[in-house]
Every structure is written in structure tokens, then in C-alpha cells.
Amino acid sequence: MSPLPSVPSRCRAVIFDWGGTLTPWHSVDLEEQWRVFARQVHAEETQALSLAARIIAAEDAAWVRSRTDHSSARLHEILAEAGLDADHLRREAALAAYREFWEPHTFTDEQVKPLFEGLRERGARVGVLSNTIWPRDYHRGVFERDGVLGLIDADIYSSELAWTKPHPGAFRAAAAALGVEPSEAVYVGDRPFEDVHGSQLAGMRAIWVPHSQIPVGQQVSVDEVPDGVAHELIDILGILDGWQSP
């Protein structure tokens, strides 16, 4: 058997976005998630819909800030802004219903495990950098459930940073967690603004995965062109092999 090709020495790590990249893109009713949550807090529908509307507004504002000034947010902050006390008796039941709503949309793409294994066989470290309001433990639980957590060398979530993508600081934090310079890393994601523009701004190469039907309100036009395009996740191995030095 011939030896596996090596990833170029300049590429020591490949870092992935999560939603829409490592998970297949799903169109989700983003308002219904909070109605499901709020109905666990309030049995009376009018009260539940009022709470849901406040949470929707708080979350929308957080994501607008993410796109404009690239500041991060956390789930507990959004709930507090909507007026739900941290010690509310129904809070945990509501969070359980919210997680159950999201579970079908969190399953890891079946190509991820062989992709991660192929990267590690080529000597590349594997990382994750995701814009998220959810805590680290939630995401790691998803990866563990799907049998890929042990293949990830470092994972960083905006909920534990001051910034979101496309801020260069988020990408630098991911590179540092992997022990590489940004110039030695490749970033893979489905969003031209957050993922392609942001990673290139930080000094990384970018591979775009055009899987996602991103809502118009979340789109930001960019001039940057990705260094590679992967229509299937497993295609990333071939792209990296093609970047080998002669």
C-alpha cells in the first residue's frame, strides 16, 4: 500500500464550524424553539407566548450584535434579558424541552468520522470553532453521542469568548488551542462572512462548504473568495492533498 500523502507543512490543523458544516443544514423554526421552551414555564398560553416573544427579541438582538460588532452572547444572558430568573422552578424543564426540540438538528454528518480520521492520519490536528450561545458541555455531549469527540484535538465556542466569528480573535483562539499559528491552519465553514471572510482575515486559508440555505437576514456580502470549495465534507481530504508542495 502506498503511503498517505502528507498535508503541507504550512497546514498543521484544520478547524471546523459546527452547525451547517459538521451537521447537515436544517431549516429550523427559530420562533417555535422558544414557544416550546416558554410553554414549560407558563401553562397559560398568553403568558407563554409573551415570554417567547421576549426571548426571541433578546436572541435576535444578540445575533445582530454578533454580525455588527462581533460580540458574543450566552444562553443564560439571553434568558435573563427576557426576564426569566435563573432560579425559576420551571427553568430546567423548559431547557430540557428546548434541547429536545433541537436534538434532531444536531446529528453529526456521517462523513465527519472518516474525514477526521483521514486528517489525523495525514498528521493534521482537528479543531472546532463555533458561533453559539450554548455552553461547551452541550456541544461536547453532541460529539460524544455521535462518536467523534475523541477525534477532536481542541474545540472553542464563542459562548466562552468575548468575540464571535468573523472577529480575528476567535480564529486566533482556536489556533492557539491547537498549538499552531493561524497561517498553519485551514478553516472550514458554510458561511461566506463568518467563516470565509473571518478566517482569511485572521491569516488562515478557507474552505467553503456550500450546504446551507442561510436566511437573507443573516447574510452579509463579502468580496473574499474561498481557497477551496467542498461540496461533500470528505472532499476536504482531496483539497488538502492537492495543496501539497511539489
Positions of the model-derived regions?
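N-terminal helical cap/lid subdomain that shapes the substrate entry/recognition surface
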Residues: 2-122, 136-137
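Asp-based, Mg2+/Mn2+-dependent phosphohydrolase catalytic module
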Residues: 1-16, 43-46, 113, 117-120, ...
